[in-house]
Amino acid sequence: LSVDNLLRQSVELIGYFPSIVANAYAVKRHHFGGESLHIHYPEEGLSTAENFLRMIRPDKSYTEEEAHLLDMMLMLHAEHGGGNNSTFVCRALSSSGTDTYSAIAGAVGSLKGPLHGGANAKVMEMFHYIQENVDPHDDGSIRDYLVRLLDGEAGDRSGKLYGLGHAVYTLSDPRAVLLKKYARHMAQIKGYEEEFDLLQKVEELGIPLVQERRHSDTPMCANVDMYSGLVYTMLDIPEDVFTPLFASARIAG
């Protein structure tokens, strides 16, 4: 457990993780979905984002805009202070003297929880329920369904509006502000403007509803999970890969 060896393991994990995720997804798609198995090796000289998009797509094609957006996503998710659940777990495990791989495995186990790294997938699950049950051009219809979600009468019946609120940020989540800007641009390119507009309505109408339920006038904002799932969808990244890709970014922290 020398310092040099720990550093080597850590740097190698940062480098290998995106390829592990991409290849694991290819095997999963082949084994469970019966699709052709496409294994693409990373190409030297390309960024992590470029290689990841290249590796998960059978034809290896991607655009500069897609790679730039994914690169930004990876940076936004790379670290967010030592107090978040998965980083705390990693530090707690490391403090026991365990090995690097055990500490990272524990952190990944924490990250996949629906209240942490799995939240972007829960946002998209909620969004699909909303799409199926509202008139996207009628604010009243959207508001009524959000009330049903909060009452635990619709969706996953958890009584939650995923993607809203943060333990630290109140006025705004700077990650969400930046991501929303680029998500709007990608929606225009990819033809997802209606989906983006509906998600924005969920943000605008949902915040006052949650505040009302909490009997609170404390400012509240959308968090980074509100738009990250839609961005991954626009990048043709399947929901199975949302959280593993988050882990690929967060492993640096």
Regions from the PLM with identified roles:
Residues 1-253:
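Non-transmembrane, aqueous-exposed alpha-helical and coiled segments at domain scale
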